[in-house]
Amino acid sequence: MKQLWAPWRMTYIENHENVDGCVFCNAQAKEDSADNLIAHRGERAYVILNRYPYTGGHLMVVPFEHKAILEELDAQTRGEMMELTSRCMIILRKLYKPQGFNMGANIGEAAGAGVKEHVHIHIVPRWKG
């Protein structure tokens, strides 16, 4: 597969700028429920399911602090984000049995960030074919 195309993401692509405030700050301010999609809250960051996933199991690790780039976060927050990312990959391997992962952050508009004002790490399980 040369391109990862998820047609169900068109709703996000066409409407993502209609959200009042920051989607990640809004999510973390709500109580945990199926509606806000938060799977885990740590001390400095949380794990949230992607509402418009590229694949099943697409998760994001998001700091509670509203910062646009990783280097604006303190070392403890960056460390917790990487620990949560690793734990997510362990769990996803057990549940989804992916053959690989795409993991990373799109920082800035030129890098393809959909929410460029609040840095976050994507964890996308992948399979061949």
Regions found by a protein language model. Give the residues of each.
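HIT superfamily nucleotide-processing domains
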Residues: 1-129
